[in-house]
């Protein structure tokens, strides 16, 4: 399908087939489309509303063009959010990654700088002294030897550069805002994925089913968080064994008291790091929200058989203080690798 035809179709609110979307997105990500065409298509698609088929095709193109990380995928999980919830909480997903690693999971963390919060994964890793710009083979070593590896999105998705200008100038959400969680460079088959809009729950679960994921929990809290909330019930769309089931969970289901989110809000990455460190050793409300999310990730990864068991494993992990040691270990390891690459 030609760009002009695709723009006309989405402007008339016509859904595109997988093949047509794939062709258009490939033109965008290989530099064949003009900025005006990119902007027109993305706006038209957003106003129409993206289907699971269109999202799947767009993600497939990104996967075909990305720089992959080759690693064993057993018990491999990504903990990621779309961003866009505007809550400005500390980085719950990154803290959860270290808890999961200390409990026996393996985390391929795919992230970028902040979208909606004061501290994205990359921002936090910067202040924690964890090197971001490692080549794929060394990211794989981090995952294999420590249990956590961080894949800085711009290093693995260079094809995205063709859409940066139009996206920045438009300043609105487009399909690109939800593609990151669907394009893990290590091919993590399991995920805890937070979304900013409840309408995306089943759409994202269906897209991941089509892309071959094994066990995924897509979550959106009733208070708007793109993760499992400590302050409100959270809706879940769970993909497992090729089937999608929806249900709702709440903190009290796991013996955790509901608490306000205000103490978890941060302004800087340094603020976020303080709360992350508290969460990693089981201190305060930060520990509780991390236990919920890390527990869900342990369940998705197959380390725990149930969500409840996952939360207990996460709490035991925090009590051991090992997650904080994992973070220090990753900082030391990536520093050594980064210095080696500079020689």
UniProtKB/Swiss-Prot annotation:
What positions belong to coiled-coil segments? none
Task of the protein = Catalyzes the transfer of the phosphoribosyl group of 5-phosphorylribose-1-pyrophosphate (PRPP) to anthranilate to yield N-(5'-phosphoribosyl)-anthranilate (PRA).
Note the subunit structure: Homodimer.
What InterPro entries does the database record attribute to this sequence? Anthranilate_Pribosyl_Tfrase, Glycosyl_Trfase_fam3, Glycosyl_Trfase_fam3_N_dom, Glycosyl_Trfase_fam3_N_dom_sf, Nuc_phospho_transferase
Protein family membership: Belongs to the anthranilate phosphoribosyltransferase family.
What protein does this entry describe? Answer: Anthranilate phosphoribosyltransferase
Write down the top EC class of this protein. Answer: transferase
What does the record give as its pathway?
A: Amino-acid biosynthesis; L-tryptophan biosynthesis; L-tryptophan from chorismate: step 2/5
GO CC term (a single one) = cytosol
Molecular function per GO: anthranilate phosphoribosyltransferase activity; magnesium ion binding
Supply the source organism for this entry.
Chromohalobacter salexigens (strain ATCC BAA-138 / DSM 3043 / CIP 106854 / NCIMB 13768 / 1H11)
* The enzyme's E.C. designation: 2.4.2.18
Positions bound to Mg(2+) 2: 226-227
Top-level taxon of the source organism: Bacteria
Q: Which residues are 5-phospho-alpha-D-ribose 1-diphosphate-binding?
A: 81, 84-85, 91-94, 109-117, 121
What's an example Gene Ontology biological process for this entry? L-tryptophan biosynthetic process
Reactions it catalyzes: N-(5-phospho-beta-D-ribosyl)anthranilate + diphosphate = 5-phospho-alpha-D-ribose 1-diphosphate + anthranilate
**Is Transmembrane helix given among the entry's keywords?**
no
Query: A Pfam family name for this chain?
Result: Glycos_transf_3
């Amino acid at each position: 399908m030609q760009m002009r035809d695709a723009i006309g179709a989405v402007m008339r609110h016509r859904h595109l087939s997988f093949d047509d979307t794939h062709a258009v997105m490939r033109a965008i990500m290989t530099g064949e489309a003009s900025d005006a065409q990119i902007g027109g298509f993305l706006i038209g698609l957003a106003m129409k509303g993206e289907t699971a088929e269109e999202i799947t095709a767009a993600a497939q193109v990104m996967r075909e063009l990305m720089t992959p990380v080759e690693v064993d995928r057993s018990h491999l999980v990504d903990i990621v959010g779309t961003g866009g919830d505007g809550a400005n909480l500390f980085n719950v997903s990154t803290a959860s990654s270290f808890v999961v690693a200390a409990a026996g999971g393996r985390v391929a963390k795919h992230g970028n700088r902040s979208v909606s919060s004061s501290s994205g994964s990359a921002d936090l890793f910067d202040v924690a002294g964890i090197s971001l710009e490692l080549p794929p083979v060394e990211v794989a070593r981090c995952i294999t030897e420590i249990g956590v590896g961080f894949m800085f999105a711009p290093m693995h998705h260079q094809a995205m550069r063709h859409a940066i200008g139009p996206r920045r100038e438009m300043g609105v959400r487009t399909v690109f805002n939800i593609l990151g969680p669907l394009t893990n460079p290590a091919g993590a088959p399991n995920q805890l994925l937070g979304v900013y809009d409840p309408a995306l729950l089943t759409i994202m679960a269906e897209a991941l089913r089509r892309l071959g994921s094994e066990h995924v929990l897509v979550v959106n809290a009733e208070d708007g968080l793109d993760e499992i909330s400590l302050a409100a019930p959270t809706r879940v769309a769970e993909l497992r064994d090729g089937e999608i089931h929806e249900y709702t969970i709440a903190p009290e289901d796991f013996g955790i008291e509901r608490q306000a989110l205000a103490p978890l809000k941060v302004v800087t990455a340094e603020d976020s790091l303080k709360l992350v460190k508290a969460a990693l050793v089981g201190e305060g409300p930060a520990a509780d929200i991390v236990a919920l999310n890390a527990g869900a990730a342990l369940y998705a990864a197959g380390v725990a058989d149930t969500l409840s068991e996952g939360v207990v494993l996460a709490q035991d992990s925090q009590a051991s203080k090992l997650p904080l040691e994992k973070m220090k270990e990753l900082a030391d390891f990536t520093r050594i690798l980064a210095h080696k690459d500079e020689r």
